[in-house]
Amino acid sequence: MIQNTLYWHDYETFGLDPARDRPEQFAGIRTDEDLNIVGEPLNIIARPTPDTLPHPMSSLITGITPQQALEQGLPEAEFIAHILMKLSQPGTCGVGYNSQRFDDEVTRNPLYRNLHDPKGREWQHGNSRWDIIDMVRDCHDLRPEDTVSYTHL
C-alpha cells in the first residue's frame, strides 16, 4: 500500500517570471498526513546558465549571489532530477504557497528543457498537488485576529 505524504516545497528564482527566469534554490521537506517529518529535507542551489541574467534584486532577497550559485550550484539537469525524484514519489501531494501560479511553472520549465514529462509528477502514481494560498486567505478572512496580516509578511 502506498503511504500518502505531503512534500512541502518552495523555490527562490533569479527573477519573477517562471517561464523566463531560472530557479536559484529549492527547499523541500516531506511529512506524513499528521505532519510528522518523513525522511531528510532537501535544500539545493542551481547553477546559473550562461544564457540568462539574474535580476539584481534576487541576490539581495535570497542572499545567494550569482558567483556563489556558480560555485555551489548543481547543473540544471542534476538540480531538476533531485526535485523530480522527491515530487514523483508515489502517494506524494506537492504542497506550496502560490505554487499553482509560480512554483509549479518553475518546476515544469526545467523538466521540459531536460526532456522529462513536465506534468506527470502531478498525477501519476496517486500523486496530487495543493496550493495553500487560498486556504491561508480563507483563514485570514474567517479569523483575522488570529492570523498574520499580509502587510506584516
Regions found by a protein language model. Give the residues of each.
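Entry/capping segment at the start of metal-dependent catalytic domains
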Residues: 1-36
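Conserved beta-strand scaffold positions in the cores of enzyme catalytic domains, especially
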Residues: 6-8, 41-43, 127-129
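Short, flexible loop/turn elements at secondary-structure junctions
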Residues: 13, 48, 134-136
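Short, surface-exposed acidic-centric catalytic microdomains
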Residues: 40-62
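Conserved DEDDh/DEDDy metal-dependent 3′-5′ exonuclease domain
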Residues: 59-143
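Conserved small/polar residues in nucleotide/adenosyl-binding loops
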Residues: 151-152
